[in-house]
Amino acid sequence: MQETLTFPADSAVVIIEGVEEPIDTVGAEQTSEIIGKYFALCDSDADWHDVHLPINLSLQAPDGMSISGRATMVRNEEIYISMRVMGFEAAVIYANNDSAYFVDKYHKYYFAESFKALMGSSCLTIGNLQDLLLGRAFAPGQGTVCEESAITLFAEDDNAWGIEGDPESPQGMEWWCIATMDDVPVVSSVSFARSETSQADFIYSDVQTTPAGPVAGIVDIALIDGFKGASAQLKWSIKDAKWNTDKQINFKQPNGYKIITTDQLLRFLGQS
């Protein structure tokens, strides 16, 4: 990673290519510590090719629903989540960098949308979404935060620090993440905001060590868009995960199924 680190002696901010103003001020000792935590976070991540693991998805608001299944991810390429009821595959969620699908095998209908539209026309990639779901630090539209060319590091409090993207970058949103001050820092939250009334927060807990580095076993998600809100929780069975087995995903658009609209999908999920 090619970067330029510049910071005043009394600032807790590290400026990496492009961010000019510090956003917090503390002593030089904490500044140095935060720099060290940033590089420790970078070092803790590891490359991975694929993972297959159990998942439990709970929709908590505005209505409640819980279902379990298994997820398969191929790094930077695909996500496949098979939701099962009494051992039978009842629904499928699939996404790649081009498209996203929700397939209801019981009622025989499906929803399809471009991945970019589903992400709100932001620059998020399928790899970014994988990191969001696993609790790994990343830079929207790029790879890890260690590959981002314009970020700011800042002091959150005595026990946490953060990474903020360049507000002038063409990403269509603000983003930031908070990490711990542990010897091996872990990401505790990632947030996105388009405005004061439009924000998404991902809160991570039960972080465990894996071949990909630290991964969150529990992901709490809160979405706010104007006067509407939604919340959900993902639980991964990290201990049962199988990493780097060259797992293949063979998803095909359903034949003979009825296609449904976004409004119909939201009604199905109890969000309208």
What positions do the PLM features span?
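N-terminal leader/targeting segments and the immediate start of mature chains
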Residues: M1-M65, C123, Q253, K258-S272
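Gly/Pro-enriched, hydrophobic low-complexity segments
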Residues: L5, V145-I260
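Low-complexity, intrinsically disordered segments exposed to solvent
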Residues: K37-L41, N56-S58, G64-R70, Y80, ...
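Edge/loop elements at the starts and ends of beta-strands within beta-rich repeat scaffolds
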Residues: D43-V51, P62-M65, T72-V74, I93-A95, ...
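Hydrophobic lipid-interacting interfaces of membrane-associated proteins
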Residues: N56-Q60, M86-F88, F102-V103, H107, ...
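Amphipathic hydrophobic-ligand
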Residues: M65-S68, F88-A95, Q171, E196-D201
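An acidic-aromatic
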Residues: E78-D131
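C-terminal low-complexity, charged extensions that often adopt amphipathic alpha-helices
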Residues: F115-E156, Y257, L266-S272
